[in-house]
Regions:
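Intrinsically disordered, low-complexity boundary segments flanking structured domains
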Residues: 28-29, 83-84, 271-275
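Short amphipathic alpha-helical segments and helix-helix/interface helices
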Residues: 53, 57, 84-88, 108-112
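Long, low-hydrophobicity ectodomains and other hydrophilic envelope-associated domains
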Residues: 45, 64-79, 89-291
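General N-terminal targeting signals
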Residues: 20, 25-26, 59, 113, ...
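C-terminal segment of N-terminal export signals and the immediately downstream linker at the start
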Residues: 22-59, 63
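Well-ordered, non-membrane alpha-helical segments in soluble/globular domains
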Residues: 50, 80-82
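N-terminal export signals
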Residues: 1-29
Length: 291
């Protein structure tokens, strides 16, 4: 099965916030620095700010990065966009990790584009009232090196919630390189045929069920990924709080050192056999970018 990346993009844009934002018109980074010398956490006034920030700080502690700067817009980004413009001017050369609600994200995107920001990743995150899949995450990233989905999957697997994570990489040139993949206990991993290879990691679902959950038809053209090309993501501490896990994953990708996969896109689907009560409905957007 040759998966058209444009079809995957449609799935990403159907995720909620990315539909509202549209495909970013600003510049995606071509070769961003692997390690951030200066990292800034921007809290856009969303109700998830505190939990997201906790996850970011844990990730910084694990890699012994103690230079994190935190900026917050009280009352939300829409109440004072001028402050954001000033922050962009004052933080040239910094790597930004940002979180905000959907409405603020549209304003943030335009102001960042005008400031010449180079985007590494943008993600839409949601908890919904759906027993089959209450936690849903979609990402656009410059390349597999900026992917955060594998880290998030490793953090969520023991949280007792079913989830789906979809990532698309604008630079998918690594798909034709030496095969590399991610692995975790309980996941079965597959690779699609074709030049725009996709990796699919399923836990608690068959390949057919995983494809159906993602809106992919049929299982033809998928082959199991051999274990000898796979590496396990090391996550030292789990968290029952999914928003904190998103903050951790986003920061881990921003700080570098994650496991890239040789693919143009990838997805993680997990079905919890003893799910917890459904989390409250929430939606927010995350960004990683260089100014």
């Amino acid at each position: 099965m040759d998966i058209d990346r444009r079809n995957l993009m449609k799935g990403l844009l159907a995720g909620g916030a990315l539909l509202a934002l549209g495909t970013p018109s600003w510049t995606f980074a071509d070769e961003p620095a692997k390690k951030a010398k200066r990292c800034l956490l921007f809290l856009g006034g969303a109700n998830v700010d505190g939990r997201f920030a906790n996850g970011v700080r844990v990730a910084c502690q694990e890699v012994k990065y103690d230079g994190l700067e935190t900026m917050k817009v009280n009352g939300g980004l829409l109440s004072d966009p001028g402050k954001l413009v000033s922050l962009f001017e004052q933080s040239k050369g910094a790597r930004w990790i940002a979180v905000m609600d959907d409405a603020s994200a549209a304003v943030f995107q335009e102001l960042a584009r005008t400031a010449g920001a180079r985007l590494l990743s943008v993600g839409a995150h949601a908890s919904v009232k759906d027993d089959a899949c209450p936690l849903r995450h979609t990402w656009l990233a410059a390349s597999p090196a900026q992917g955060a989905g594998a880290v998030l999957a490793s953090r969520l697997i023991d949280a007792g919630e079913s989830f789906s994570i979809i990532e698309s990489f604008l630079d998918g040139s690594s798909a034709a390189s030496k095969p590399t993949s991610w692995s975790a206990p309980g996941f079965a991993s597959y690779r699609s045929s074709g030049s725009d290879a996709m990796h699919l990691h399923c836990s608690g679902l068959s390949l057919l069920e995983g494809c159906a959950q993602l809106g992919l038809t049929g299982v033809e053209g998928w082959t199991p990924i051999p274990s000898h090309v796979s590496q396990r993501e090391v996550v030292s501490r789990q968290s029952p709080q999914w928003v904190e896990s998103v903050g951790y994953a986003v920061a881990a990708s921003a700080l570098g050192g994650r496991i890239p996969e040789s693919c143009s896109s990838r997805a993680f689907v997990h079905r919890a056999f003893t799910p917890h009560s459904l989390p409250p409905t929430q939606r927010f957007v995350s960004f990683v970018m260089d100014i």
